[in-house]
Amino acid sequence: MPELAVMELGRQLCGKMKKQRKAEMTVLTVMKGLEIHFYLPDTHQLEYFKDCHTAEDLCVEGCQEDATSHLCADNLFALSEESQDLWYAPNHAFKITEETSIKLHYRMRFYFTNWHAPVRTESPVWRHSLFKHKGVSVSPKGPEGTPLLDAASLEYLFAQGQYDFLRGLAPVRAPQNEAEKHEIENECLGMAVLAITHHAKSNDLPLSGVGAETSYKRFIPDSLNRTIKQRNFSHVYVYNNVFKNFLNEFNSKTIQDSNITLYDLKVKYLSTLETLTQGLGRETIEPKILKVSGESDGSPALTLPSGDDGLGYEVQVSGTTGISWRRKPVPNILIVKDKTKSKKNKADKQSKKEMTKRKTVMTIFSDFFEITHIVIKESCATIYSQDNKTMELDLFYRDAALSFAALVDGYFRLTVDAHHYLCTEVAPSSVVQNLENGCHGPICTEYAIHKLRQEGNEEGTYVLRWSCTDYNYIIMTVVCIEMDLCESRPVPQYKNFQIETSPQGYRLYGTDTFRPTLKELLEHLQGQNLRTENLRFQPVLVGLGQPRKISNLLVMTRDREPDSQRQPQVSQLSFHRILKEEIVQGEHLGRGTRTNIYSGVLKLKSEDDDDMGGYSQEVKVILKVLGSGHRDISLAFFETASMMRQISHKHIALLYGVCVRHQENIMVEEFVQYGPLDLFMRRQSIPLSTAWKFQVAKQLAGALSYLEDKKLVHGNVCSKNILVARDGLDGEGGPFIKLSDPGIPITVLSREECVDRLPWIAPECVQDTANLSIAADKWGFGTTLWEICYNGEIPLKDKKLTEKERFYAAQCQLASPDCEELAKLMTHCMTYDPRQRLFFRAIVRDIDMVEKQNPSIQPVPMLEVDPTVFEKRFLKKIRDLGEGHFGKVELCRYDPRGDRTGELVAVKSLKPENREEQSSNLWREIHILRELYHENIVKYKGIWHEEGGRSIKLIMEFLPAGSLKEYLPRNKAHIDLKTLLNYAVQICQGMDLLASRNYIHRDLAARNVLVENENTVKIGDFGLTKSIKDNEGYYTVKDDLDSPVFWYAPECLIHCKFYRASDVWSFGVTMYELLTYCDISCSPMSVFLTMIGPTHGQMTVTRLVKVLEEGKRLPKPDGCSDRLYCLMRRCWEATPEKRIDFKGLIANFQQMIDNQ
């Protein structure tokens, strides 16, 4: 190098050093108020000296300052305080006083790597496109949607990227060796080339001499500048010349020959910045303590403190990968090789191994669509994901926790749901207001029209959306019906109306009146007629609709599209087939809607068992059996199983599969230890804590949020369909619940059955079961939350079906808890407009918010329980007791506690084929037994009904000894005449009560007298019993039923008239049965058939009447005294008026007993 050149270079360097020292000695003036600085050189800072401003409002003003579109401004930018390394949440309020001194930077915070899509190994990033959603083919090389950034946003990002690169806010990656170090330096110089060229082109400077005019040092990181300064003059001189030559060659050949644009330079600069720097596109948070936990096994959270080396853990948030964490890596220190040594010593080798080991891989916690909500408590931020996994970060101060929550919340809105917030503490006021008003963000016109088409294109319906271009306008896109002159039919057209926003309020553009709020303006417009051109209509708002609605607000990637884009396959039935040999049916546990529930065992095979032919494992399961009598709803049953097959969630019960056994269809589901939630809650002697109840509610809401994301409808959300897997009463781990299958869907139930399920069924589904949707599950959740609050109490349990219908018709609400926020949450779930019900993600978030208030839930006053109303699911069948022509009687255990301590009862029901015809008779029997209470009449316990009351069952006391017809032959040796007379007295006493109440039994026989014990009998089976009027004294049979003719008096057979005395005749026949010990060979039917000869049908009655008119009667039984037989004959007088009554019979029998 020539000596003069070296001297000149030294003089220039000395001059620059003096200027630098002079600048450092300059005393800065203290700023006042709040300043927002921009990275664009021509944009002046914003200054505020008074009032209160939110970060979101300041961001909007910043976007307007640099001409960023509303679409990009709405969710990409935030305010940062560099001195504190802090981002402010959008709802943070800056209260500016005379003492305020805050300097903020307006920055793009939310960044997606590969948004420019040059890296083929990574997924490109784009805003959602309707064309792709509709299945329109897109070129694999071209964009799959609209670009992520507009021109102004790209310009600003480029300026921000330069700033971060030069000042080390985006530090270059650490080199692993000397070669890579030189490679990184060259890349930094390449960045300078791009920046200088962009500077020259944007300012219309000649490219040929730009290298001589501009120093590269202004465009490389400060750290690299310091490194270059430490080198000798000759090396720097060469360095400068090499750079100038490369810059000139790049501008003269590459730029001009390839027609490179400013846009290309920006994209190349930013894409290179992603690979050259470390951490671009992701934020790294270093908490004091990190806790990561999963809830499945109830284990405590995994606490991750600092290690022995003082290094803790770090959490990274990225727009493309979600949230992850790892142990902080050891700082990489570049060791320069000592050329005098041929080998490293063993200590160096060991050190290198340790360093490699410490470069830990990131562990994924969750993607954004898996997050349900975020909770802030002081300086701790806790993220909850589906399956109730949690990540808790204990940060150094509260603002850091809010900053972290705002980061995750912002990415969630960009990638999952543009109209939802995960955390109330950082919720943007614009999102909250949009939700309240049913207004969309700045979606484009195509999406507004798409939504209106989905809603049916009804005239006057409109979508509210913020303008994509103008921050001061809201657009109403309205459906207008016009006549198509060519096709002579009405067709929908879409008109846009503008709503102007200003400090005075809101007004429809072109009108004069401002309304203070958007909601008031919309309410005003609701009753108005709007006109446009020659059209006139009344506006009707279409709300935001279901969560995760597609729009151009969503940022998409090929490998991470929301589940809502993939429709569940419900049309194709799919479930695992279980062979009948693989299940063993156990005891009856109760009844569901048209199903019977049993315990059972499922035999499972392993891969080795396939060869051996055996089973290696047995699992306890629940069997839900749909009987052969319900084959008409088998398809609906299979659809439920197919839906459950698509589900995998720890808070939803596992469906093993379906077994077809003969004509029965069986759903095989996992056994859950503590059974239904409502029974569990009622069994607790000590009140359950509020925290316990909230944990159950959150788990249920999380499971339903999972179903909502998959667009699957449960359809029968209630506490008896929630199973308790872990009670959590000891405080360890808390409760753990599982949502069971919905059973038979309401779409195949009758209206009466649907009304019977109120208030769990949503009102719109009562009107038409085809309205069953996810919104119905939200109503069911609201009702279930009410049950949980009140310890399993049944809402509206004292209401009849008609009263329940009126409850809905009047749009009534259940009694609200004392806690105002909890009552508000229930109301939002149970609003009668299904479109206004909260999304389950919002429900999960709000439950946590209410829980933080630590409310006390006062139990409702316990209503008096009707002991005569039995719930069908608690009737556990043991065996059949008997069967007649019209019905049957079963022995069941009524076991509401589920611990096999319930009482045994007899359950009488009609056969399905006789249900329509005979139900009135069974109801009559129920009403009679309700009114009769006597020690010698079988006790009425109550009823249960299903199918909306169309199917009923009579619950009576169970008498294990059976009827006299069965009891007497078995115990003849132990029963003497006195015992028989005692039985006769008891029967007469019961019949006398019946007669005094103006009832006629009409079916008195030994088969209908039940034995309680060896000393007591009771009259049963009042199925044919009739009520008579006082002034008539008889009842005329008007139905053609099978009748016990051999026990009937002549007037019954001839005139079909029944008197009280007719029962006396039947008693005489019953007395004959007692005295013959119900011997089949001499039964009344056998004796009378012998008298009348072979016959059948109506001829039997005719011949029987003739025999009776001839005065023939049943003979005197063996061992019967003349006095006793004479008394029996008095029961068989041909004329009813001449027959003895029951009081007379009692007196005579009592005398006989006394004489024994």
From Swiss-Prot:
Broad class of enzyme this protein falls into: transferase
SUPFAM superfamilies named among the record's database cross-references: PH domain-like (SSF50729), Protein kinase-like (PK-like) (SSF56112), Second domain of FERM (SSF47031), SH2 domain (SSF55550)
Reactions this protein catalyses: L-tyrosyl-[protein] + ATP = O-phospho-L-tyrosyl-[protein] + ADP + H(+)
Sequence positions bearing Phosphotyrosine: Y1034, Y1035
Membrane topology: Peripheral membrane protein
Origin: domain of life: Eukaryota
Keyword Phosphoprotein in record: yes
InterPro entries: Band_41_domain (IPR019749), FERM_2 (IPR035963), FERM_central (IPR019748), FERM_domain (IPR000299), FERM_F1 (IPR041155), FERM_F2 (IPR041046), JAK (IPR051286), JAK1-3/TYK2_PHL_dom (IPR041381)
Main subcellular location of this protein, as a coarse class: membrane
GO cellular component: cytoskeleton; cytosol; endomembrane system; membrane
GO molecular function: ATP binding; growth hormone receptor binding; metal ion binding; non-membrane spanning protein tyrosine kinase activity
A Pfam cross-reference name: FERM_F1
Cofactor entry: Mg(2+)
Cofactor note: Mn(2+) was used in the in vitro kinase assay but Mg(2+) is likely to be the in vivo cofactor.
Keywords assigned by UniProt, alphabetized: ATP-binding, Kinase, Magnesium, Membrane, Metal-binding, Nucleotide-binding, Phosphoprotein, Repeat, SH2 domain, Transferase, Tyrosine-protein kinase
Keyword Repeat attached: yes
GO biological process: cell differentiation; cell surface receptor signaling pathway via JAK-STAT; cytokine-mediated signaling pathway; growth hormone receptor signaling pathway via JAK-STAT; intracellular signal transduction; protein phosphorylation
Described function: Tyrosine kinase of the non-receptor type, involved in the IFN-alpha/beta/gamma signal pathway.
Record note on domains: Possesses two phosphotransferase domains. The second one probably contains the catalytic domain, while the presence of slight differences suggest a different role for domain 1. The protein kinase 1 domain is also called the pseudokinase domain and has a regulatory role through the transactivation of other JAK kinases associated with signaling receptors.
Record-given protein name: Tyrosine-protein kinase JAK1
Organism field: Cyprinus carpio
Source lineage: Eukaryota, Metazoa, Chordata, Craniata, Vertebrata
